[in-house]
Amino acid sequence: MAPKRKSGVSKCETKCTKACPRPAPVPKLLIKGGMEVLDLVTGPDSVTEIEAFLNPRMGQPPTPESLTEGGQYYGWSRGINLATSDTDDSPGNNTLPTWSMAKLQLPMLNEDLTCDTLQMWEAVSVKTEVVGSGSLLDVHGFNKPTDTVNTKGISTPVEGSQYHVFAVGGEPLDLQGLVTDARTKYKEEGVVTIKTITKKDMVNKDQVLNPISKAKLDKDGMYPVEIWHPDPAKNENTRYFGNYTGGTTAPPVLQFTNTLTTVLLDENGVGPLCKGEGVYLSCVDIMGWRITRNYDVHHWRGLPRYFKITLRKRWVKNPYPMASLISSLFNNMLPQVQGQPMEGENTQVEEVRVYDGTEPVPGDPDMTRYVDRFGKTKTVFPGN
């Protein structure tokens, strides 16, 4: 008898018992820096690079340029003056290193601001380094000699406390005020102090974190580094990086290369959005101090910083509705007046009545009626 062919389906076949899992959907719409972030703009002109540098602001301004009338101190501070007592500490403004900052204007992207979506520049990455570290090898100047007895050896190089911070953002850097001693008397002419912002003398809370002592880095060479620090509670639209090395004889340590790129994107893949077609750069680079030979006076030394920023275009939802633009236009046409206070703590407004719809005539028109915070109508009955 001939062999019978086996019937049925091959046993090697396996059926999928259940559907394959699908990736869970994730939110595409992000709100970043006050903007609703949409897709990227693609194309040959959607990426641009900008190179710039910031010079140090150690206390001595760029002018005068004469090397005999103060220009020789550019890049340095003037001699640091010590306090005579705990209650008499008044440093000179030209001895205080301050923040360097600048705003780079970017090409305009939107001719029509009435559209639902707008294009905006987004900072993607930055290459940066401190320039001029080789100048610290100068050991033949008129500084304090290493052999103080015979005035021989070499000139003491720059050394001491070092502070390096740089920031790239779509808005000015947010700063938090914090000082070592609230009794310090900073001069308000020429620099921005905590008293300049709060209009009050410093208090003990300014030696820790005082929530009201905040500012924005909106002026170059005006915000002392020992007073103003990057605010970690803000700066959502800014990236900052920094390090500090303390000590009276700490040697400067610097690494420099043109191959290191710092990515500015956050965990959602979005970088600082440049509002108003402008990107803001900020930095401080303090290398230490030099000690003069005659009077043992200390001068802070700062170096410039180079930036190369890469930006790309991104679509965002228009944050400026036409109603608000027209409203601000009409409001700006009205004259600005300064009258008596009608808002705030010293308001002179006694009573405000708001009517909505109609109702039967009440028997007691003076009865207090109001709507509470939950939207319910309340009536206060008169007492005896």
From Swiss-Prot:
Protein name (record): Major capsid protein VP1
SUBUNIT field: Homomultimer; disulfide-linked. The virus capsid is composed of 72 icosahedral units, each one composed of five disulfide-linked copies of VP1. Interacts with minor capsid proteins VP2 and VP3.
InterPro entries hit by this protein: Capsid_VP1_Polyomavir, dsDNA_vir_gr_I_capsid, Polyomavir_VP1_sf
Principal location class: virion
Additional remarks: The virus attaches to the surface of cells by recognition of oligosaccharides terminating in alpha(2,3)-linked sialic acid. Strains that have Gly-92 (small-plaque strains) can also recognize branched oligosaccharides that carry a second alpha(2,6)-linked sialic acid.
Subcellular location per the Swiss-Prot or TrEMBL entry: Virion; Host nucleus
One GO biological process term: caveolin-mediated endocytosis of virus by host cell
Chain's role: Forms an icosahedral capsid with a T=7 symmetry and a 40 nm diameter. The capsid is composed of 72 pentamers linked to each other by disulfide bonds and associated with VP2 or VP3 proteins. Interacts with terminal alpha(2,3)-linked sialic acids on the cell surface to provide virion attachment to target cell. This attachment induces virion internalization predominantly through caveolin-mediated endocytosis. Once attached, the virion is internalized by caveolin-mediated endocytosis and traffics to the endoplasmic reticulum.
Pfam families: Polyoma_coat
Keywords (A to Z) from UniProt: Capsid protein, Caveolin-mediated endocytosis of virus by host, Disulfide bond, Host nucleus, Host-virus interaction, Late protein, Phosphoprotein, T=7 icosahedral capsid protein, Viral attachment to host cell, Viral penetration into host cytoplasm, Virion, Virus endocytosis by host, Virus entry into host cell
Domain comment as written in the entry: A DNA-binding domain overlapping a bipartite nuclear localization signal is present in the N-terminal region of the protein and is required for efficient virus formation.
Family of the protein in this entry: Belongs to the polyomaviruses coat protein VP1 family.
Modified sites of kind Phosphothreonine: 358
Gene3D superfamilies (alphabetical): Capsid protein VP1,Polyomavirus
Residue ranges, annotated region (C-terminal arm): 322-384
MF annotations from Gene Ontology: structural molecule activity
GO cellular component, one term: T=7 icosahedral viral capsid
Keyword ATP-binding: no
Span(s) of short sequence motif Bipartite nuclear localization signal: 4-18
